[in-house]
Amino acid sequence: MKTELTLLDRTLTLHRFPNRSNETLQAWDAGDEYIISHVEEMNLEPGKHILIMNDSFGALSAWFSKDHDVTMMSDSFISHRGALKNLQRNQSNRVNFLNTMDDIPHGIDLVIMQLPKTNRHLVWQLSQLRQALPEGCQVIGVNKVKDIHTSTLNIFEKYLGETKTSLAKKKHRLVFSSPNCQPIQTVEPFVEWDVDGEDIRLKNLPNVYSGEALDQGARYMLEHIPQDPELRHIIDLGCGNGVLSVKAGQLNPQARITCVDESFMAVESARQNIKDNLGEEGNFQFIANNCLDGFKKNSTYLVMCNPPFHQQQAITDHIAWQMFCDAKHVLSNGGKLIVIGNRHLGYDVKLARLFGEANVETLELNQKFEILQATREPANFNK
């Protein structure tokens, strides 16, 4: 796996986060190289204030912070931590970190953005740029050619201004736009809906998975959250909008519930949904984190988990494996991990390897999903 980005007589050492010994994926892509080359050809005067949005692991921030004042804005805790590590690794100049719910700073001279995965997040970011940037400030986006559609360009035109694209290079394309003087399109941050068959109403911020309806996996999982008066602490790992936590809180009002996600918008959505559905009297925590980094061993009784199978734009199963390992670490003896996943992902095999085959059972399955339960045995359990 390549860890050195060499371009225009400069070299940066870049790693993904978390740093794994058997990593097979790079911390940058051809889109980063394309946009770096283009901006360097612009011959900007040193000291420009550059806003970099959705920088996966800090390659763009590390590059441009050498000569410019850089603000990095991302919804991803993983991206923030990865960028910080890479900035330190390359002894880069200081970068200001923001999440995508923060206000866009004044005095931006140029915006560089990796286009987000969902149109709803793109609409949000462009609408925020439109309100904050001076007319004519250039915005340069980049993405794979196959992911830039006519609808993508229409969103730029509608929410920002006149838009054009570059030629394709290494399967990537640049998008050029700037704010115009037309009336601003107002975008509400939340969408709301009721969950059919449940006494639950949900709000989702723009970058939260399954933005305008409950995804099938979460709906299936709702039916299998345990009700146990002995439960004292529940962790919702990869909480998304917090729907599992809301249901768990309804069933187990005595329990302390901790919502964890790497998306700042997901954590804030969970906070809002628990407040709206359960009130403010309960004992709840909301943490943006890399899985369960920093959590104490043997500190909880139940972990609920609906793992993602992508990190940034890459398809990968290492996040699920890290979630399972972290869950085992924090579970008390006899504590349980309940997982939902697509059947083809083979989570049963992974859990059996980690917890022991005798301690993994299938709670429910249908043609698409399976719900698995793994029980933590005492430390002297012989595998």
Swiss-Prot record:
It is an enzyme of class 2 (transferase). Belongs to the methyltransferase superfamily. RlmG family. GO terms for molecular function: 23S rRNA (guanine(1835)-N(2))-methyltransferase activity. It comes from Vibrio atlanticus (strain LGP32). This is Ribosomal RNA large subunit methyltransferase G. GO terms for cellular component: cytoplasm. Its EC number is 2.1.1.174. Keywords: Cytoplasm, Methyltransferase, rRNA processing, S-adenosyl-L-methionine, Transferase. The keyword Transcription regulation does not apply.
